[in-house]
Each structure stands twice: as structure tokens, then as C-alpha cells.
């Protein structure tokens, strides 16, 4: 999901 803007977790 939006993990790419947090550090690639989603």
C-alpha cells in the first residue's frame, strides 16, 4: 500500500 512513502512496507 502506501509503504513506499514510509520505507517500503506495503
UniProtKB/Swiss-Prot annotation:
GO MF entries: toxin activity
Expression tissues: Expressed by the venom gland.
GO cellular component: extracellular region
Superkingdom as given in the UniProt entry: Eukaryota
Statement: the UniProt record of this protein carries the keyword Secreted: yes
Name listed for the protein in its UniProt record: Toxin To61
Alphabetical UniProt keywords: Secreted, Toxin
Location in or out of the cell: Secreted
Amino acid at each position: 500500500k502506501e509503504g513506499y512513502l514510509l520505507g517500503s512496507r506495503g
